[in-house]
């Protein structure tokens, strides 16, 4: 090889190495930016998760409080008001459920009726305000040969099992 050809090859090699250094530098910079954006996204998702868990806890406490109030009014004579509240509650639940399903199209399980999860009493224990409802809207107890005691009813009403699926329960 001649000195001139070697000089040309060295110059060509130097340019290639310089381009590689520039490309590697750009890649490292983009990688740093990508990692920073990914960390920000992860932090935002974590913060949103914490907020949603707090909201879920608050909603579960509110459901507990409302169920306690319903149990406290089982024997009272405020039938019109209770029926109105239950109807409003069912309407609001159906509206929220339909909005939720617009974002997540999944078939609801059969019998997804909030009245069943809010009030669980047998027809003999039914509040007078509910006795006028059509049979398909009567809250039903699970079939059993004996009536549950009030502790069993309260445990069901206040456990996650008595909550709608959207609040962490199976219903």
From Swiss-Prot:
Sample GO molecular function, one term: double-stranded DNA binding
Phenotype of gene-disrupted mutants: Sensitive to cold and thermal stress, simultaneous disruption of dph3 suppresses the growth defect during thermal stress.
Presence of keyword Lipid biosynthesis: no
Subcellular localization(s) per the UniProt record: Nucleus
Ranges where the record places region Basic motif: 12-51
Presence of keyword Nucleus: yes
Segments for region (Disordered): 125-171
CDD domains attached to this UniProt entry: bZIP_ATF2
Main subcellular localisation: nucleus
Keyword terms, alphabetized: Activator, DNA-binding, Meiosis, Nucleus, Transcription, Transcription regulation
Single biological process term from Gene Ontology: silent mating-type cassette heterochromatin formation
Gene3D superfamilies in alphabetical order: 1.20.5.170
The bZIP domain, residue ranges: 10-73
GO cellular component: atf1-pcr1 complex; mitotic spindle; nucleus
Similarity annotation: Belongs to the bZIP family.
Subunit text: Heterodimer of pcr1/mts2 and atf1/mts1.
Protein known as: Transcription factor pcr1
Source organism: Schizosaccharomyces pombe (strain 972 / ATCC 24843)
